[in-house]
Amino acid sequence: MKRFISGLAMFLLVSTCVLAQTNDSKVKEVIVVFKTHFDIGYTDWSDNVRYNYANSMIISALSTVDKSKDLPKDQQFKWTISGWPMKEILSKAKPDVKLSVEQAIKDGNFLVHALPFSMETESSDLEPLVQSMGYASKISRAAGLPLPIDAKESDVPSHSWILPTMLTNAGVKFLHIGCNPASRSPEVPLLFWWEGPDKSKLMTFYYGEYYGTSPAPPKDWAHKTWLAIIQTNDNSGAPTYEEYREAVKNVEKLNPGAKVRVGSMADFYSTIIKENPKLITVKGDMPDTWIHGYMSMPREMKSSRVLSKSTFNLEAFSTLSSIWGRKSEEPIPAFVDQSSENINLFDEHTWGLAMSHGESGYWAYGKEFEKLRAKGYYDIIEYSWKEKGNYVTGSEKLILPVVSRELKRLAAAVNVEGNRIVVYNPLPWERNDMVTVQTAAAFKKSLKNVATGEIVSIVKDKNILQFQANHIPAMGYSTFVSTGEEAVTSKSNLSFDAEKAMMENEFFKITFDKKNGTIQSLIDKKSNKEMVNANSDYKFGQYVNERFAKTQTDKYAKDYIKAGWNWAYQELGRINLDDTPYKKSSGRNAEITFSKDALSVTAIMTFKGDADLVHNYSMVFTLYENKPTVEVIWSINGKPAEAWPEAGWISFPFNIEHPQFKLGRLGAVVDPVKDFVKGSNLDYGFINTGVGVLDKNNQGFGLTSPDVPGLSLDRPGCWKYSTDFVPQKANVFFNLYNNQWSTNFTEWVEGSWTAKFYIWGINNYADGSAIVVPSEEIRNPLMVGYTEGAAGKQGATSKGVSVSEKGVLVTFFGKNRDGEGDVIRLWEQNGKTSPCKVTLPDDNKYKSVQPCNLRGEKTGEEISIKNNAFEVKIKANQPASFILI
């Protein structure tokens, strides 16, 4: 966020505030760390920021290093920088500058910490986060240095508790979080052990007043060591030599009698840990109070979630293909690395320029907004948002065509002649699901699974062919061929009654509300329970558009802003609003059509815009044969850009009294009542898998979206900041889009896109079976390749990697980025500690596995592979990585 005072000036201002506090300080040693806050954008277009880092900024930092060389070693200038910008500097700096930078790294004047940059961790996924540590690891290894044991996040107020799990399992010992000075902070101690869902504990220093810390400790600081982080403002670079010396002298002045040395965050950890500090343990997730900003780019967010899976599924598929006897014709690891980097950059916390900077238009609404936009006054700021979206577009261009080609090559390689469809399962357990192939080729009435001999029915509608693919091996494939044989099928349970507006299958019976185009009743036929709360203020499967009032945006700003009101209100409130009242709108009087085929029954609701809601949109509700889920698809056509604060939701009010909620968040399933740290976001958050809504008997309903991670419980949560909110009603709201941020996220949402949602019943709740497994199967659909012609030489079916425990994920299987060989990474998500047997494909050449941490460092004794399998004990929610030897 924009500050009207430089980082160094802020540091010196804080100095005067703490001077009176430090006379009786017990501190014997102060480690001074210098850093600048890195935004990929915000102060300028991101390309310009990247250029400046590799040119003027690093040259200025080298100058400060050179001028300090005559000082004692512990007084020489040392500059801490994140992994990714240092990677950019090394790759883009001029040759002579690059050599100087490399030498400064080896000499310890440039210090690279473990994380790539400040991220909104909640927007990411498990494997992209792991890969994001690779930039710093590679730089350290190239310089012959140990891997960094320190890490830093700045600006973003709160983070997913995946951080202590991930960093600890990567060998990192210390994390510093510096909060934006205007934003509310989680209620945590200054220094504490942060315990992750796997019970890993990470020493964490949370400073709520600014990016860095104060130059001297507060009065109640109980330790002999203090960390003074002098962090200059957004992209402002390293201090000059004169500023550097002034800052160090200021620290000495404020800590009389203490030894003051310039160093790293790791130096602070290594010193204070010798004191055996008595620290409070905080076990809890801290939902991000900024995370709603990602849903200002709903299409890109949807694609990012797909790419977070498909990118690493591609590498696993390529690795397996080599074992099966067909090496890829393309450099798959290089494509994966570039896609992973783009995903990381999308998860980086900066989006674009801010309206408050005055560099592109100003806040206007209605006709005035349309006029300014037509004249091009917003072109500069809109391009900055486009830069952010291009990271996702770039990954799509890399990954999606390669996945398509690889699947076609697999289909061509199998020893089956003629038309054939190959179905690949990217998950490490056998599964069944429906697949879709688009082809104009002629097919007979059924398909045969070559491996099992099963005959399955097909539905062919012009160029769209669908069928149920059963018994697809874990991370393996099966081949299907056209046949004239009749499929043996039981009587269909699919039906609809247009007059009564009803449809059903074996598992569910749905009755629609014709007036509102929503679900009036949804019966879970297995439990005979009604899912829908008919008395709710919201309808089930209802699209809701909110237009907020100035009273609401102002209340949010007053609740959330903790300091700097004069500038922070412009970036966290919404200026120039008039007194137009709050409005909540939904479509009505939909056109309803039903259809049925051998695999599904569908109701389509089409809504035309009117004076109350100007959007044209549709809702599609589908039940499938032999599939215990309800599919809901929302689709909007030509949404206009709207600068007025707004949000769109799909509501699901469930018929449960006194509900319990289970949220499948990043790294673990959590209880929002017990596991959220106060002061973080209790009103709105992201999920990674799914949601459970349970009654007192641990029975109820599950739901997820592969496209929409943002949701609120009980009531819609945009423009709300609550310190003690506890959801009471069994309502789940998925956030389709919003433009709440007035800072640097996209400020108006427009266009056409879709979002899917899935609902199922829960009989006996367990994290794995109720949430993780169904959600992962939805996020990782079966992959299909089609070809025709001569047969290849590869088997018609092959097994891949399997795990004995469903819900243990294989997040990576491919080339070791930290050394020789291949790596396989498991991640326990069932929330239970148990042994897990991992079975590798036939014909693999691996003899043993070497346990390692998330950065490839060996951690234990080799484990022999016997009969293509090895067994390990994995703790609940823990990652486990192995080098295959």
What are the residue ranges of the model-derived segments?
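Bacterial Sec-dependent N-terminal signal peptides
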Residues: 1-23
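C-terminal (or distal) subdomains of carbohydrate-active enzymes
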Residues: 9-10, 163-168, 182, 188-190, ...
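N-terminal catalytic cores of secreted or lumenal carbohydrate-active enzymes
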Residues: 21-127, 131, 140-143, 280-283, ...
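Histidine-centered catalytic/metal-binding microenvironments
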Residues: 26-31, 37-40, 318-448, 460, ...
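Acidic, His- and aromatic-enriched active-site or binding-groove loops in soluble protein domains
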Residues: 96-114, 164-184, 193-205
